[in-house]
Amino acid sequence: CIAAAKTKKTLADKIKAVVYGKDKGALYAWKVLASGLIYAANRVPEISDTIVEIDNAMKWGYNFEMGPFETWDAIGLKKSVDRMIKEKMPVPAKIKKMLARKKTSFYKTEKGVTQYYDFASGSYKPIAVSKEALSLAVLKSTNKPVKTCASASLVDLGDGVFCCEFHTKMNALNSELIDF
């Protein structure tokens, strides 16, 4: 599963390659990830009212690139829940109810606004964002990067200001980035 993951470009594809592989490592990774996802779902609303707060806590507190609900979206909510049920894992009722309502992801973006699934209302709600905050993901979804290569992207922030987003491992400089 590790060899397959190394061939993938995005974190989401790497995680999918690991947990949906067929070797012992993949089976172990699946069991650990699945139990963590179930645990996170069971903590709403016990420790947090929304999935956004749990995802942010894991990213900000533990330096994860994706929180548990973002990871769940990355591996496919329906596909993973089907597997959990097949393997007799205790899928939370709120997740089953969500899927019964034909909601197949925790997050979605419409017209540049990222929304999260709210268990309490059973609907998607916009993520509250400070007016001073900039999100490269949102900017890149509404405006294509001005220039891009395998090592970096140049994103227009507005007012003649640009952001150079590194894509290299550990944000290391390489010759392609220098030529960029």
Identify the meaning behind each predicted range.
Residues C1-F180:
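N-terminal glycine-rich phosphate-binding loop for ADP-containing cofactors
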